[in-house]
């Protein structure tokens, strides 16, 4: 976060009977800028000035001023070259008629309704966050209550993060509590089309122990018939500092949303509804010394999707609904050291397992017709 320190030089003197013209003291100012420290594009915390790529940072103050339950509208406003598609007052949905497509500098996703983003990677605390079966991010899962700040690497990052980062990388850094004490924040808003957004967060730090618990509920009827959206979710994070150099933390986030797609005005749809549940959890042990730093982390993401593709006026309702389950888990270890000025050596290992299964459930009989069932493993050392 950029901090701006102002030093005002005040020129004064003893009171005198003779008036004397002096310059305006407030016009003499000095501004000092403290650069941001980021973790995107490198494993360890690094001054953004020392990175060979372009990284933009959105801080917590900017997130709170925007007062939006989703991070994407905020990022579209603050990040140059980032574009996202939208379709209504709240929510993006999935499958046909979905929005939330992302692109950076024209690369990432196809700006067409219903087509997923495949060239933009979203991370939470450095862990990949996308559907394990389809391989695309779920835009409604990236909520403002999670984020302490958001770091956006603009431009190709496939060497660091894989082929699904051709457009860039969005890294959501989760909330922290730096000072001792208890902080509770609540926010409720109500507006047009029966739109409600609410959030409550409690943060505690007592000595070496920290905790964060957040919950939210958001809904809207939408500006068209059959365009309702409802979402509720929760986030919890616990941490413990063993010393000034070693810390352990773990977190869990679960969100569920119901989204309806009315189709186009020319060709409306009936009962095109989706019921989506997404979850993620992670555990990390970190060390920070003057000359070296590193971490061992584990993460697990999962999802459950139920989708009714709906039908057009004059057609028959769907006789079966699409269902899917997906997961993604991984282990990451790295250690970075500096031996002399301008040098840094990092060694590490990453393992990821992802995949899932899909099926169509016949409504009349409950029969399950299998679709895709795929699992994959990836590992690499560096």
Stretches with model-predicted labels:
Residues 55, 63, 75-76, 150-152, ...:
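Non-catalytic regulatory/gating segments with a bias toward low-complexity or hydrophobic composition
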Residues 220-227, 231, 245-328, 366, ...:
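Flexible loop and strand-edge segments within Gram-negative outer membrane beta-barrel domains
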Residues 179, 206-209, 243-245, 255, ...:
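Outer-membrane beta-barrel channels and translocator barrels
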Residues 319-382:
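Outer-membrane beta-barrel transmembrane domain signature of Gram-negative proteins
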Residues 119-120, 126-154:
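Short acidic/polar hinge/loop motifs at secondary-structure boundaries
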Residues 20-64, 72, 288:
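Short, acidic, small-residue-rich periplasmic hinge/interaction motif at the N-terminus
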Residues 76-127:
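Extracytoplasmic beta-strand/coil segments of soluble accessory domains associated
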Residues 169, 174-204, 214-215, 220-225:
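Short strand-turn segments of transmembrane beta-barrel domains in outer membranes
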């Amino acid at each position: 976060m950029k901090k701006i320190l102002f030093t005002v030089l005040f020129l004064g003197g003893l009171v005198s009977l003779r008036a004397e013209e002096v310059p305006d003291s407030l016009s003499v100012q000095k501004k000092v800028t403290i650069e941001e420290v980021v973790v995107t594009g490198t494993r360890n915390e690094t001054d953004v000035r020392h990175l060979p790529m372009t990284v933009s940072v959105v801080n917590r103050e900017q997130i709170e001023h925007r007062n939006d339950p989703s991070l994407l509208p905020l990022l579209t406003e603050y990040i140059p070259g980032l574009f996202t598609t939208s379709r209504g007052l709240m929510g993006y949905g999935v499958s046909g008629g979905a929005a939330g497509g992302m692109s950076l500098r024209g690369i990432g996703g196809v700006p067409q309704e219903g087509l997923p983003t495949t060239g933009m990677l979203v991370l939470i605390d450095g862990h990949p966050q996308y559907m394990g079966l389809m391989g695309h991010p779920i835009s409604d899962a990236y909520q403002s209550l999670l984020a302490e700040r958001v770091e956006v690497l603009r431009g190709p990052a496939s060497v660091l993060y894989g082929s699904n980062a051709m457009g860039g990388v969005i890294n959501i850094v989760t909330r922290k509590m730096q000072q001792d004490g208890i902080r509770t924040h609540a926010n409720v808003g109500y507006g047009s089309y029966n739109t409600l957004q609410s959030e409550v967060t409690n943060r505690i730090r007592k000595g070496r122990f920290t905790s964060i618990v957040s919950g939210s509920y958001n809904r809207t009827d939408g500006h068209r018939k059959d365009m309702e959206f409802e979402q509720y979710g929760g986030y919890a994070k616990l941490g413990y500092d063993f010393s000034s150099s070693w810390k352990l933390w773990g977190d869990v986030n679960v969100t569920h949303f119901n989204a309806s797609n009315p189709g186009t005005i020319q060709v409306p749809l009936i009962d095109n509804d989706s019921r989506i549940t997404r979850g993620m959890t992670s555990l990390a042990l970190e060390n920070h010394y003057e000359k070296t730093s590193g971490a061992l982390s584990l993460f697990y993401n999962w999802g459950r999707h139920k989708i009714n593709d709906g039908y057009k006026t004059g057609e028959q309702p769907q006789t079966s609904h699409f269902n899917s389950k997906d997961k993604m888990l991984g282990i990451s270890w790295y250690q970075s050291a500096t031996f002399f000025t301008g040098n840094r050596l990092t060694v590490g290992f990453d393992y990821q397992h992802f995949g899932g299964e899909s099926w169509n459930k016949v409504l009349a009989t409950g029969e399950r017709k299998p679709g895709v069932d795929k699992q994959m493993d990836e590992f690499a050392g560096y």
